Amino acid sequence: MTAQIIDGKAIAQTIRTQLKDKVTARKEAGQRAPGLAVILVGADPASQVYVGSKRRACEEVGFISRSYDLDSSTSEEALLSLIDECNEDPSIDGILVQLPLPEHIEESKVIERIRPDKDVDGFHPYNVGRLAQRIPVLRACTPMGIMTLIKSTGVDTFGLDAVVIGASNIVGRPMALELLLTGCTTTICHRFTRNLEDKVRQADLLVVAVGKPGFIPGDWIKPGAIVIDVGINRLEGGQLVGDVQFDDAAQHASFITPVPGGVGPMTIASLLENTLYACEQYHD
């Protein structure tokens, strides 16, 4: 068996084209374009790359992009004050603060300061709670994008045994909630999980988000499983690889995401979808 590749780059581009058409229609109807404020604190190289991609994506679909690049010494109070300004700005529908933040700034305070109706990252406790209560509104971008990828396979997820490896607030935990919503029997694995191999071998649907290159051997994959690799790891030679040993895993899985070109583009596409949703549902 050789797995079919789930082309996240192509699916994300389709979404972006659809969003661009919707924004054009809004403008032609005399409505404003959605606005996204992107806040970067410090000069972390990876964060700069991510933020640049998000800003370019906004411009591509016709959103208004507000950029705030703050020095790494910016105080927590100053950052919270900027968020307050964005909260009150009627032209801004979504606020994104790029994580991680400098050590002197408490991330939970920052996340909770963003108004829930402008929390297009889907991290605010209100939005996480809505997902837990099975009435999601603004959803965490990476899990949301992954669900779009899974849907693209045409596989019925009801009753599948799903395993999520990684229990972060950004991916693992909301991912498990998303899978529960689609009828999966969901297991979350983390650094204290015993018999990880046994759990993986039972998975009809496997999502791996641990940030360790080749962490999951390909021969652990259950024949016919769907494999979603969230990891983006750069090796010494510069090559980007995922958390799953791709070549071996592709011999067992029915569908698999590549790295790069799998989950990454979908995270940004979902951010754009959330921003348009916030504009239409909350701020029109």
From Swiss-Prot:
Pfam families: THF_DHG_CYH, THF_DHG_CYH_C. It catalyses: (6R)-5,10-methylene-5,6,7,8-tetrahydrofolate + NADP(+) = (6R)-5,10-methenyltetrahydrofolate + NADPH; (6R)-5,10-methenyltetrahydrofolate + H2O = (6R)-10-formyltetrahydrofolate + H(+). NCBIfam families: PRK10792.1 (NF008058), PRK14186.1 (NF010783). PROSITE patterns: THF_DHG_CYH_2. Keywords: Amino-acid biosynthesis, Histidine biosynthesis, Hydrolase, Methionine biosynthesis, Multifunctional enzyme, NADP, One-carbon metabolism, Oxidoreductase, Purine biosynthesis. Pathway: One-carbon metabolism; tetrahydrofolate interconversion. Coiled coil: none annotated. This is Bifunctional protein FolD. The keyword Transmembrane does not apply. GO terms for biological process: L-histidine biosynthetic process; methionine biosynthetic process; purine nucleotide biosynthetic process; tetrahydrofolate interconversion. Homodimer. Its EC number is 1.5.1.5, 3.5.4.9. Transmembrane segments: none annotated. Catalyzes the oxidation of 5,10-methylenetetrahydrofolate to 5,10-methenyltetrahydrofolate and then the hydrolysis of 5,10-methenyltetrahydrofolate to 10-formyltetrahydrofolate. GO terms for cellular component: cytosol. InterPro entries: Aminoacid_DH-like_N_sf (IPR046346), NAD(P)-bd_dom_sf (IPR036291), THF_DH/CycHdrlase (IPR000672), THF_DH/CycHdrlase_cat_dom (IPR020630), THF_DH/CycHdrlase_CS (IPR020867), THF_DH/CycHdrlase_NAD-bd_dom (IPR020631). One of its GO terms (molecular function) is methylenetetrahydrofolate dehydrogenase (NADP+) activity. NADP(+) binds at G166, A167, S168, I232. Belongs to the tetrahydrofolate dehydrogenase/cyclohydrolase family.
